[in-house]
């Protein structure tokens, strides 16, 4: 448990440090390092610049997301974009509502989970074996998605929808909800516009 906590703390702080660099400055450093033959420094500066670019794109994606899902207003003060560590991409987060009734959108560009989720969605044997009353495959705006239901313990259900699109994974989570409500919310998300921006 101690090792897991330390690992996640390291990832968190590395992400924050990685996210605080300057795009134009890193590109200038990369050019200067390349011209002087310091290829390792040029490579590092370009990686930093790509991380900055992912954050800039993530902030533009937040502008595309709806300010309201059903009756839940966006809590834009908690909007967050962080650079992914270890691979290129960003995690984009927005939540809606109040603690009593909330929804969350997370978009992970270049998600490492895409391969597994696509295998689940596109292989009938695997998808069929893992399907039950709490898991099923649905379509949202033409994209296959995995819908998962968990008991909220109060006679209601929490839903989670995983939608792989382009090279990204969007997860919509809604507490105390119904299947029709979460699918209605998902249909308000501009997947095509987000996909064009993230590519």
Which residues make up each language-model segment?
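Bacterial Sec-dependent N-terminal signal peptides
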Residues: 1-22
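N-terminal "mature-domain start" segment
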Residues: 24, 28-36, 40-91, 184-199
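A broad, structure-centric signal for solvent-exposed, well-ordered loop/edge residues
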Residues: 7-8, 13, 81, 147, ...
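A short, solvent-exposed beta-edge/loop patch
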Residues: 20-31, 35, 45-47, 133-199
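Short, solvent-exposed recognition patches
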Residues: 64-150
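Short hydrophobic/aromatic-rich motifs at helix boundaries and adjacent loops
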Residues: 1, 106-107, 157-158
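Solvent-exposed, well-ordered amphipathic alpha-helical segments
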Residues: 2-4, 25, 94, 148
């Amino acid at each position: 448990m101690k090792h897991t906590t330390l690992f996640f703390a390291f990832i968190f702080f590395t992400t924050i440090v990685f996210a605080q660099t300057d795009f134009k400055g890193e590109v200038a450093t990369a050019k200067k390092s390349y011209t002087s033959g310091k290829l390792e420094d040029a490579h590092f500066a370009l990686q930093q610049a790509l991380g900055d670019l992912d954050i800039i794109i993530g902030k533009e994606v937040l502008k595309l997301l709806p300010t309201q899902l059903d009756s839940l207003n966006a809590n834009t003060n908690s909007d967050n974009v962080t650079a992914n560590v270890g691979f290129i991409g960003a995690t984009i987060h927005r939540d809606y509502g109040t603690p009593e009734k909330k929804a969350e959108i997370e978009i992970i560009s270049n998600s490492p989970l895409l391969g597994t989720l696509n295998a689940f969605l596109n292989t009938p044997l695997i998808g069929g074996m893992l399907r039950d009353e709490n898991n099923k495959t649905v379509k949202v705006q033409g994209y296959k998605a995995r819908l998962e239901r968990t008991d909220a313990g109060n006679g209601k259900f929490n839903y989670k929808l995983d939608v792989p699109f382009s090279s990204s994974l969007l997860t919509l989570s809604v507490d105390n909800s119904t299947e029709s409500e979460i699918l209605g919310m998902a249909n308000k998300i501009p997947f095509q516009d987000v996909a064009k921006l993230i590519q």
